[in-house]
Regions:
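Flexible helical/loop "lid" subdomain adjacent to adenine-nucleotide binding pockets
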Residues: 45, 55, 169, 180-224, ...
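ATP-dependent adenylation/nucleotidyltransferase module used to activate substrates
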Residues: 1-185, 189-197, 218-231, 304
């Protein structure tokens, strides 16, 4: 008797739609989507990311990762009547790119009945990212890429937005790919001890810092895209025009090439770091936080990195 080898390994009824190279699992559309939702629930429980009555701010850019996380957290939140969540979006001011993302983020929030808050670089800092890039080029200052400036400014903007809405947690859609890229990026920059701070859930070290959680930290980026496709979630597919200039992009390409040949490499990197993280934390000096003398936000220096960058731009 001939057996059908293309049947879902979970339900044993429906035709398989996707095969996970790192585990060998074959899954139908329904079981695949449920496996992603289950993985998020497991990750939240594993790292004790949430309390039953938390107010969560979800960072929503409009891309596949953030809108997928928004939909999954909305589903989970239904089981916790005392919990609540809002979406926060940062408008960096990237012409021809961010406008579409803002519309998509707003559309997803409206569909889910989630309040949507938007903060902009222009309003917070007086500059759009486009203006920053133009200003730096005119000055001949190209030591840092646009992504380096955007990363620092965006991180501060998200924290301020989450604090403004009185959130207990700030959920970001960093995937397994993002986490492994960051690990290698820190090593390439000679800052291996920084890995100790880049955890799935951050330590609360200052009253002005909203604790960050990463429910997608063990989900590959490819699978968040597939989840959005299966659940028919609208997202922006066009990449940021500045992304190609960053070292992170080179690391992404390298990791994807290795993963293609050696499935499971990204998980191995992530799990290895999780094992040695306690030792790294013991080695890393606990940096005391103070308030920036210019903007009042938490920083390890007298003047925070954002204000240092804005000085350079001005």
């Amino acid at each position: 008797m001939k057996t059908n080898n293309n049947i879902c390994d979970v339900c044993r009824r429906r035709e398989a739609f996707f095969s996970r190279p790192y585990s060998g699992e074959k899954l139908c559309r329904k079981c695949f989507a449920e496996s992603i939702e289950g993985k998020v629930r497991t990750t939240i429980a594993k790292y004790q990311m949430l309390n039953f009555d938390d107010k969560i701010a979800v960072a929503v850019s409009g891309g596949k990762d953030s809108v997928s996380l928004l939909h999954i957290l909305a589903k989970i939140e239904q089981n916790y009547p005392k919990a609540s969540f809002v979406a926060v979006t940062v408008d960096e001011g990237i012409k021809g790119y961010r406008d579409e993302a803002l519309e998509i983020a707003a559309e997803n929030c409206e569909k889910l009945g989630v309040k949507h808050h938007v903060v902009s670089f222009k309003k917070l800092y007086g500059f759009t990212l486009d203006k920053i890039v133009k200003s730096l080029k005119q000055k001949g200052e190209d030591e840092l890429t646009p992504c380096a400036y955007c990363g620092v400014l965006r991180r501060k903007a998200l924290n301020m937005a989450a604090r403004k809405v009185k959130a207990d947690k700030l959920a970001t859609a960093h995937t397994l790919d993002d986490e492994t890229q960051t690990i290698l990026l820190n090593i390439f920059h000679g800052d291996a001890l920084r890995i100790a701070r880049e955890k799935p859930i951050t330590d609360e070290v200052h009253p002005k810092l909203v604790q960050r959680i990463k429910p997608f930290c063990e989900v590959p980026e490819k699978e968040t895209a597939l989840y959005a496709y299966i659940r028919k979630i609208k997202f922006q597919s066009v990449p940021c025009p500045y992304a190609a200039e960053a070292l992170r992009n080179d690391i992404r390409v390298m990791l994807n090439r290795i993963e293609e040949k050696h499935a499971g490499t990204k998980f191995t990197i992530f799990k290895s770091i999780e094992k040695v993280r306690p030792a790294l934390e013991a080695m890393a000096k606990k940096e005391g936080l103070r308030e920036c003398s210019e903007c009042g936000e938490p920083t390890t220096e007298k003047i925070c990195k954002t204000c240092q960058m804005l000085r350079q731009i001005r």
